[in-house]
């Protein structure tokens, strides 16, 4: 059996950028003896996480962990976080380094702007994924998360309500397209922002 490695295999731009950010902070903080934390493991790679731990980097696993920290640097990983987490880091006087993927940041801005303008927000993605949890935390209006065509079929909202649809950056593009089609048939006033990362789409096509 022949095994081929896809041209697009490997870590995406956002993850590489986040990892590089942590190593840069380690380098810059050597003389200061400053404790560096990442909000969640910076990458799903045990070797990299272990190497960072050996260099003194600690992992925060949620807001309860964050509450106990009184000094140091907190690095936000590529998945991003909700607005409340940013506020907590700043209010505790910690140094904030934001390594959120720029594509995820764009979703945060879109959700914030549209929700403030009165749109209900639909996030197509996995509700348990940290990226989706972070996106939800930027909405200031009704927010719905769905992951299947069945959920899209069942979705219902007051007819006069405006909708803005975004997606988890790693969601399957064909599935997203189909779910949007289902929602659009319900004749709501809808704005669709395709926020699936180009790298994700390329990998799905290559697969």
List each language-model region with its residue ranges.
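The feature marks the mature, well-folded catalytic cores of soluble enzymes
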Residues: 1-207
């Amino acid at each position: 059996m022949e095994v081929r490695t896809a041209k697009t295999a490997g870590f995406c731009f956002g993850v590489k950028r986040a990892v590089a950010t942590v190593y840069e902070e380690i380098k810059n903080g050597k003389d200061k003896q400053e404790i560096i934390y990442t909000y969640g493991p910076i990458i799903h790679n045990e070797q990299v996480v272990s190497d960072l731990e050996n260099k003194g980097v600690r992992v925060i696993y949620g807001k309860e962990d964050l509450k106990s920290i009184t000094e140091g640097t907190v690095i936000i990983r590529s998945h991003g976080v909700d607005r409340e987490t940013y506020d907590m880091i700043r209010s505790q006087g910690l140094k904030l380094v934001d390594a959120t993927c720029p594509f995820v940041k764009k979703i945060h801005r879109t959700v914030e702007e549209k929700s403030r303008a009165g749109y209900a927000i639909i996030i197509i993605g996995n509700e348990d994924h940290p990226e989706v949890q972070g996106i939800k935390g930027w909405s200031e209006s009704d927010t719905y998360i769905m992951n299947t065509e069945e959920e899209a079929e069942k979705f219902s909202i007051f007819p006069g309500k405006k909708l803005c649809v975004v997606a988890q950056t790693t969601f399957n593009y064909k599935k997203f397209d189909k779910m949007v089609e289902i929602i659009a048939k319900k004749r709501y006033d809808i704005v669709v922002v395709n926020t699936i990362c180009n790298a994700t789409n390329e990998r799905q096509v290559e697969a």
